From Swiss-Prot:
UniProt organism field: Baumannia cicadellinicola subsp. Homalodisca coagulata
Catalysed reactions, as listed in the record: ATP + H2O + 4 H(+)(in) = ADP + phosphate + 5 H(+)(out)
Annotated Gene Ontology cellular component terms: plasma membrane; proton-transporting ATP synthase complex
Protein name as it appears in the record: ATP synthase subunit alpha
Enzyme class: translocase
SUPFAM superfamilies named in the record: C-terminal domain of alpha and beta subunits of F1 ATP synthase, N-terminal domain of alpha and beta subunits of F1 ATP synthase, P-loop containing nucleoside triphosphate hydrolases
Site (Required for activity) residue list: S373
UniProt record similarity statement: Belongs to the ATPase alpha/beta chains family.
Enzyme nomenclature, EC number: 7.1.2.2
Binding site for ATP: G169, D170, R171, Q172, T173, G174, K175, S176
Length: 513
């Protein structure tokens, strides 16, 4: 069969019409160098700041330096397989991590990938790690407390839902323990917890997981880890990943608590990245935007209004406010709170809890220095009963410290001064608390009421701890319903004061101290 020229022409036209070529446009570049996890790329003319760059071997980098002729990017993970001349391409996406209730009880890395051996996440929700903080109109004033379970903190340095309270101190002063105990104390509350471990040993993180499991608190907690063996990029990004996981709960009208342990290591990781990218170093060799590194993270902690929640959920949730509370941890060197990173974070947060080595070594745990520890907004959220019964504790301790310093130089003290010093010692002893043993509101109220009303005056200093232990056992059996009401309502009135007085009077009559 022979085809004439007309038929051939028609056949070619038909094939041209039917031909379908899907063209995909890539913005490609070529790796110029790979040094210490930093890659320099020629090309990528359309890349965005913070965009993910697809690398060979199913790995990714994040673009941080956008220069005239090349792009500086940091590799997320191992980079030994990367060599000069390899092709890379833009993805058009910012880094996203999984969010939602399915993460509760799981241990994930910075990218939200589970590392606890419990299988894949059943999750369909993702969110970019960099989001804008709620503006002033979208926020609501802080009016509800977060109970840490520590008498000294809940009484003198109260923390509210939506607050940012810095925990600062030298190494081995109990900073992480305080944070972990705060998580343990939320096990029966509606607060979801996120613990972000930055630059820590894997064995340390394993101990934290075991403690949370022992106290049945892991079920309500997400642990985000970037260990010391992980790349600096993952250590730098870990707090933002943890923050966005907490923001999800805030935005749907729930309450979340995020702990960054610790931001000093994140700052060091970011300094390392910046120096490798050849950015100009500033004070202590940190880059010029180190303040912005922490401010854009901590400003995302807030209590948001019901309108904000309603808008975010597209009308599905109405009349509920949400909150994200942040407890960043900063490690100081030899108690120097005036160095660069500590002063930056102090100026960003709503207060700080300062833990002192000298107090810790003297056996005062938690080693809180009430003189320079402060909560700027938490008092508005403090439970009424705790606020009332602890009103004089800070003053008592301040007078005690002043008189104790004075007594070291004075040979003879009058009776009033001696009494004040002795009572200050007893209050200090009463505020001591063992780790992983948080106290309920009612227990704190009872013990602080005893201190405030002078019931410790006739008790020997060495018997203070026994007095507290036996008093709490006594009320647990004799006044269980009364204590439950205080835990639920937190109110304080004449009837409650009368009952508290009756409890302690009866206890002291029956017990001998």
């Amino acid at each position: 069969m022979q085809l004439n020229s007309t038929e051939i022409s028609e056949l070619i036209k038909q094939r041209i019409v039917e031909f379908d070529l899907t063209s995909i446009i890539y913005n490609e570049g070529i790796i110029l160098s790979v040094i210490d996890g930093i890659i320099r790329i020629h090309g990528l003319s359309e890349v965005m700041q913070g965009e993910m760059i697809a690398l060979p071997g199913n790995s990714f980098a994040i673009a941080l330096n956008l220069e005239r002729d090349e792009v500086g990017a940091v590799v997320m993970g191992p980079y030994s397989h990367l060599t000069e001349g390899m092709k890379v391409k833009c993805t058009g996406r910012i880094l996203e991590v999984p969010v939602g209730h399915s993460l509760l009880g799981r241990i994930v890395n910075t990218l939200g990938i589970p590392i606890d051996g419990k299988g894949k996440l059943e999750n369909k929700l993702f969110s970019p790690i960099e989001t804008n903080a709620p503006n002033v109109i979208e926020r609501q004033s802080i009016s509800e407390p977060i109970q840490t379970g520590y008498k000294s903190i809940d009484a003198m340095i109260p923390i509210g839902r939506g607050q940012r309270e810095l925990i600062i101190g030298d190494r081995q002063t109990g900073k992480s323990t305080l944070a972990i105990d705060t998580i343990i104390n939320q096990r029966n509350s509606d607060i979801k917890c996120i613990y972000v471990a930055i630059g820590q040993k894997a064995s340390t993180i394993n101990n934290v997981v075991q403690k949370l499991e022992e106290h049945n608190a892991l079920i309500n907690t997400i642990i985000v880890t970037a260990t010391a063996s992980d790349s600096v990029a993952l250590q730098y990004l870990a707090p933002y990943a943890g923050c966005v996981m907490g923001e999800y709960f805030r935005n749907i009208g729930e309450n979340a608590l995020v702990i960054y342990d610790d931001l000093s290591k994140q700052a060091i990781a970011y300094r390392q990245i910046s120096l490798l990218l050849r950015r100009p170093p500033g004070r202590e060799a940190y880059p010029g935007d180190i303040f912005y590194l922490h401010s854009r993270l901590l400003e995302r902690a807030a209590r948001v209004s019901a309108n904000y929640v309603e808008t975010y959920t597209k009308g599905k949730i109405k009349g509920k406010t949400g909150s994200l509370t942040a407890l960043p941890i900063i490690e100081t060197q030899a108690g120097d709170v005036s160095s660069f990173i500590p002063t930056n974070v102090i100026s960003i947060t709503d207060g700080q809890i300062f833990l002192e080595s000298s107090l810790f070594n003297a056996g005062i745990r938690p080693a809180v220095n009430p003189g320079i520890s402060v909560s700027r907004v938490g008092s508005a959220a403090q439970t009424k009963i705790i606020k009332t019964v602890s009103s004089g504790i800070r003053t008592t301790l301040a007078q005690y410290r002043e008189l104790e310093a004075f007594s070291q130089f004075a040979s003879d003290l009058d009776e009033v001064t001696r009494k004040q010093i002795n009572y200050g010692k007893k209050v200090t002893e009463l505020l001591k608390q063992k780790q992983h043993m948080p106290m309920s509101v009612s227990q704190q109220a009872l013990v602080l009421f005893a201190a405030e009303q002078g019931y410790l005056e006739d008790i020997n200093l060495k018997k203070i701890n026994d007095f507290e232990t036996q008093l709490l056992l006594y009320v647990k059996h004799q006044y269980h319903d009364f204590m439950k009401i205080i835990d639920q309502e937190g109110n304080y009135n004449d009837d409650i004061e009368k009952t508290l007085t009756e409890i302690i009077s009866k206890f002291k009559t029956n017990a001998s101290f």
